[in-house]
């Protein structure tokens, strides 16, 4: 019985928390390539670091 309760808590409460990182990566990709145009390899004065585009060999968005 305790295993069923544990699985219920794990599935319904912890899984949505774990998927937030995926949504952030998708949001960063959209912001970087669609809204902002392109990624840069170096940060300039007014640019800020981003998360997912660093995996695509870029550090900042314009």
Curated annotation (Swiss-Prot):
InterPro entries hit by this protein: Beta_defensin_dom
Keywords on record: Antibiotic, Antimicrobial, Defensin, Disulfide bond, Secreted, Signal
Domain of life of the source: Eukaryota
Main location: secreted
GO MF, one example: CCR6 chemokine receptor binding
Ranges in a coiled coil: none
Disulphide bonds in the chain: 32-60, 39-53
Keyword flag Zinc: no
BP term (GO), one: innate immune response
Annotated signal sequence range: 1-21
Compartments (UniProt record): Secreted
An annotated GO cellular component: extracellular space
Function comment: Has antibacterial activity.
Family recorded in the similarity comment: Belongs to the beta-defensin family.
Annotated protein name in UniProt: Beta-defensin 133
Protein's organism: Pan troglodytes (Chimpanzee)
